[in-house]
Amino acid sequence: MANSVFAKLLGQGDYLEYPAADGTSIEPGMGLERIQEGGETRVQPVSTAGAESTLIAREQRNPPRSSTGNPLDQEYNPGDNVESRGFTQHEEARLRLAAGADLATASNATVAEGDELGWYSDGTLAKNQGNPQYEALEAVDNSGAASGDHAVITVKQQE
């Protein structure tokens, strides 16, 4: 299994750090939004379906969160510094696909190569979310997944 969110980068791969908002759990590969909390800028998973965010939580590398296990499986907790990066055209990334049990229509977590994907209201991607921004580069079926069991899917931004 791959161990990095970004599959194809343009440029240096510079990143930004923001503390994770209170009450949030952030998985590498989730879409993020910036909020103001306690007088500082923090991040949380995208909270509106169809949002236009291109800020992505990447796996923590500086320093790594753990010397064992896949960095994509090591989530950020409230207050942790989240390494994030803008996702630009012509790049490819491994982002989180919604679990079927979390969606009103579980089949929106069944993705074929070439399908258009948009943000769901929990920072994951799904079909039919309005305002699709990404194109699936592989087929993944996460329709039978339990709540919170987010798959990883390789995508690129739509042109």
Question: What are these model-derived regions, one by one?
Answer:
Residues 1-159:
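Surface-exposed, low-hydrophobicity beta-strand/loop segments enriched in small/polar/acidic residues
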